[in-house]
């Protein structure tokens, strides 16, 4: 799965005579399209509140866009995933420009490190970390230092001549 979007899905049980206005359930779901977002919504609603698609309805579904998509932010992501040995809870920190990009990075990372597939990963919560002091993970902390510089170890100078009698040396 790739190119996720964030959807807000609001649904409820079908109204009955005993409960004319049922309680609304809202979820923020990351999916590639509305169909998958609805499907995941019903999957989680059945697990959490015992409401099936046949006995419920979706009131609204909206795509959520990032407020500042060019600003780099730190995100904390709480995840529950099923592995070959059982179910695990996990907290990861991701540095990215948007919630959706952070979740895409998370799915790639979980696939690479833990061989976890999309179907076995449940994102519980995604929160932006406002203060740099609240960042816990070293792999994110290393990018928060002031005056961060990246070395350019193998620089190649532009050759002045079109033709040369020897190969250029690129090690200085």
From Swiss-Prot:
**Xref: InterPro entries:** Ribosomal_eL20, Ribosomal_eL20_dom, Ribosomal_eL20_eukaryotes
Give any single GO term for biological process.
cytoplasmic translation
Instruction: Name its cellular compartments.
Output: Cytoplasm
What Gene3D superfamilies does this protein map onto?
3.10.20.10
Concerning Pfam families, the annotation shows:
Ribosomal_L18A
How is this protein annotated for GO cellular component?
cytosol; cytosolic large ribosomal subunit
Going by the UniProt record, its keywords in alphabetical order are: Cytoplasm, Isopeptide bond, Phosphoprotein, Ribonucleoprotein, Ribosomal protein, Ubl conjugation
* Annotated GO MF terms: structural constituent of ribosome
Modified-residue entries (Phosphoserine), positions: 32
Q: Where is this cross-link: Glycyl lysine isopeptide (Lys-Gly) (interchain with G-Cter in ubiquitin)?
A: 125, 131, 149
Q: How does it assemble?
A: Component of the large ribosomal subunit (LSU). Mature yeast ribosomes consist of a small (40S) and a large (60S) subunit. The 40S small subunit contains 1 molecule of ribosomal RNA (18S rRNA) and 33 different proteins (encoded by 57 genes). The large 60S subunit contains 3 rRNA molecules (25S, 5.8S and 5S rRNA) and 46 different proteins (encoded by 81 genes). eL20 forms multiple interactions with RNA and proteins in the central protuberance, connecting components of core functional centers that are located far apart.
The family classification in the record reads: Belongs to the eukaryotic ribosomal protein eL20 family.
Note the PANTHER family from the entry: 60S RIBOSOMAL PROTEIN L18A
Question: What's in the misc comment field?
Answer: Present with 54300 molecules/cell in log phase SD medium. There are 2 genes for eL20 in yeast.
Explain the purpose of this protein: Component of the ribosome, a large ribonucleoprotein complex responsible for the synthesis of proteins in the cell. The small ribosomal subunit (SSU) binds messenger RNAs (mRNAs) and translates the encoded message by selecting cognate aminoacyl-transfer RNA (tRNA) molecules. The large subunit (LSU) contains the ribosomal catalytic site termed the peptidyl transferase center (PTC), which catalyzes the formation of peptide bonds, thereby polymerizing the amino acids delivered by tRNAs into a polypeptide chain.
| Name of the molecule in the record | Large ribosomal subunit protein eL20A
Q: Which organism is it from?
A: Saccharomyces cerevisiae (strain ATCC 204508 / S288c) (Baker's yeast)
Quote the gene name from the UniProt entry: RPL20A
């Amino acid at each position: 799965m790739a190119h996720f979007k964030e959807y807000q899905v609001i649904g409820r049980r079908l109204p009955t005579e005993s409960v004319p206005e049922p309680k609304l359930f809202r979820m923020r779901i990351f999916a590639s399209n509305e169909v998958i977002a609805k499907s995941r919504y019903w999957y989680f609603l059945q697990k959490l509140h015992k409401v099936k698609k046949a006995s419920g309805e979706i009131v609204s579904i909206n795509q959520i866009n990032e407020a500042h998509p060019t600003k780099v932010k730190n995100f904390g992501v709480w995840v529950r995933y099923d592995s070959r040995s059982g179910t695990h809870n996990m907290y990861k920190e991701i540095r990215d420009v948007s919630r959706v990009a952070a979740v895409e990075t998370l799915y790639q990372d979980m696939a690479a490190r833990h061989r976890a597939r999309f179907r076995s990963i449940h994102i519980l919560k995604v929160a932006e970390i406002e203060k740099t002091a609240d960042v816990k993970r070293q792999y994110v902390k290393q990018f928060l230092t002031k005056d961060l510089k990246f070395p350019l170890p193998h620089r190649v100078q532009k050759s002045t001549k079109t033709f040369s009698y020897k190969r250029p040396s690129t090690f200085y």
